[in-house]
Amino acid sequence: MKTFEKSSAAFNRAKPLMPGGVNSPVRAFKSVNMDPVFMERGKGANIYDIDGNEYIDYVLSWGPLILGHADDQVVEKLKETTEKGTSFGAPSELETKLAELVIERVPSIEVVRMVNSGTEATMSALRLARGYTGRNKILKFEGCYHGHGDSLLIKAGSGVATLGLPDSPGVPETVAQNTLTVPYNDLESVRYAFEQFGDDLAGVIVEPVAGNMGVVPPEPGFLEELRRLTEENGTLLIFDEVMTGFRVGYHCAQGAFGITPDLTCLGKVIGGGLPVGAYGGKREIMEQIAPSGPIYQAGTLSGNPLAMTAGYETLVQLTEANYEYFDRLGDRLAEGLSAVAKEYDIPHYTSRAGSMVGFFFTDKKVKNFADASSSDLEFFAKYFKEMLHLGVSLPPSQFEGMFLSTKHTEADIDFTVDAARQAFKRLKK
């Protein structure tokens, strides 16, 4: 069994200095009932904690590290860029290089604006949707996470397509009432929302594959009908591809599903592990943003040289062949985990979208947040701890998927599946 003495000491030192001792809630490991593990370094598909323990990593910084940790080319180019200066507060050619690559590969994006996080991207996209349409309301889906902006930290009201309620203290009810929340994959609720509020509906924002309630792909026809309804109503369709961008496919989820939204939000992979976000779309919409148009958005570090370098050097290495590899590797992982769960009669459901794999401890097909919430969270916490001690780093939440990188191998997958077999054997005693 691994020991975490140094991590425990580090957490005790951090707790009085930062809320909960961390800078993002899921890192606190509360949902798995243990103190967080403090990491020191990573290389390829492996990560190492401050106690010297080694793990195969399926967190990958929550998705950005599609080339694995400390990719040689990314690191070398970052060193070169750093020596020239870390930030200028002025345009650089690095921004243009990354913008060209994003526009080339993302079907919906004709013009792109770089920002510093996925939350900035979604907040800015909503402001743009409202400013462009002259409408106020936004439709989102239960279980889809779009960052921590006030307009998006909203839960559903008591009835279908009712006005939203704040999902966090500090979010004013007046803000929440302009956000409608309906179940993911539920077209009947979407149609009802359009019937009731269509005249004031500025945008529909959706993760084309929901990645923050596990990995939940869209049901056949779901995205197609969202596209039809929004076009018919003059509402903007916004794909939040902060997580799915360049993970679900070479041309992102929209390319994989053949659905082109009006606006797309990106992050994670396009920063190669550095803080970044972006939003883009049709030229006629994007030209409403300052300084081209009247809708304001700005950022001191937007388009900074380091993030642009890491993003460009990441994307330029990705090829169509990588995504074929992810399909093979992802299937091997999902099918392997399912097989060992069946060996021990453990209720489960697996899902996959590109290099994202979901593994739920429920006997339901997971197609929305209610289904995901039926998972056995207590069992997941025990499974997480067993896997950690066996050398596998999983996201510390049942509602997060596993991420693959180009550095993961079939041997890594087989090791992980065997670890799951050992974990289930212990847990079923």
From Swiss-Prot:
The keyword Isomerase applies. It catalyses: (S)-4-amino-5-oxopentanoate = 5-aminolevulinate. Its EC number is 5.4.3.8. GO terms for cellular component: cytoplasm. Its cofactor is pyridoxal 5'-phosphate. One of its GO terms (biological process) is protoporphyrinogen IX biosynthetic process. It comes from the Bacteria. The modification N6-(pyridoxal phosphate)lysine is found at K268. GO terms for molecular function: glutamate-1-semialdehyde 2,1-aminomutase activity; pyridoxal phosphate binding; transaminase activity. It is found in: Cytoplasm. Pathway: Porphyrin-containing compound metabolism; protoporphyrin-IX biosynthesis; 5-aminolevulinate from L-glutamyl-tRNA(Glu): step 2/2. Keywords: Cytoplasm, Isomerase, Porphyrin biosynthesis, Pyridoxal phosphate. Belongs to the class-III pyridoxal-phosphate-dependent aminotransferase family. HemL subfamily. PANTHER family: GLUTAMATE-1-SEMIALDEHYDE 2,1-AMINOMUTASE, GLUTAMATE-1-SEMIALDEHYDE 2,1-AMINOMUTASE 1, CHLOROPLASTIC-RELATED. Homodimer. This is Glutamate-1-semialdehyde 2,1-aminomutase 2. The lineage of its organism: Bacteria, Bacillati, Bacillota, Bacilli, Bacillales. The gene is hemL2.
